[in-house]
A protein has these predicted regions:
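Flexible "arm" and connector segments at domain edges
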Residues: 1-175
């Protein structure tokens, strides 16, 4: 199995997110940027890299992917709100597929982690339209696979639609 992303896959994800976002009347770029950073930290927390007292740190794979899928949702939403074009999709796909990401996103390296955590807010607010989307897809490619992340995202979006329909998480105030 290759760990590649296609333009068709990315365009499908962008459309799924656009369809979902159309259900959110209060959608706005600033809140989406904040949510993106929050979701990064929620995903990062599932790695438990700092829990050196545990024999096997890290939440189960499905929990990790669920949180990263949330980050992907906001990355897609940010791209859509910033009017991503097909040329940007090609740029994201080319970057994801071209780079090997060797030794990238090593959150077990304390110095790297400190630098990354300091810069995450700058990355999400960068003027380059593809940065938030590229970042989450690259993390997905390094720590899991593109297909695992896409599958987790689609599963999460089904649940998010159910929340908006009032058929899931009724007691959590989604509708």
């Amino acid at each position: 199995m290759t760990n590649h992303l296609t333009v068709d896959q990315l365009e499908e994800l962008l459309q799924i997110q656009k369809d979902f976002d159309s259900r959110i009347p209060t959608l706005n770029l600033q809140d989406s940027r904040i949510a993106y950073v929050v979701e990064f930290f929620e995903w990062f927390n599932t790695l438990e890299t700092f829990k050196n007292w545990k024999k096997k740190p890290g939440k189960p794979l499905d929990v990790q992917l669920d949180e990263l899928a949330d980050m992907l949702a906001f990355g897609l939403s940010i791209a859509n709100q910033r009017n991503i074009e097909e040329k940007h999709s090609h740029e994201v796909v080319d970057k994801i597929n071209a780079l090997k990401y060797e030794n990238a996103f090593d959150f077990y390296d304390k110095d790297y982690t400190k630098t990354f955590l300091t810069e995450i807010n700058n990355l999400v607010n960068e003027k380059k339209i593809i940065t938030p989307l590229h970042l989450v897809l690259a993390i997905g490619k390094v720590h899991y696979s593109i297909n695992q992340l896409i599958d987790a995202y689609k599963k999460k979006m089904e649940h998010n639609h159910a929340r908006q329909d009032g058929t899931a998480d009724k007691d959590k105030g989604y509708v």
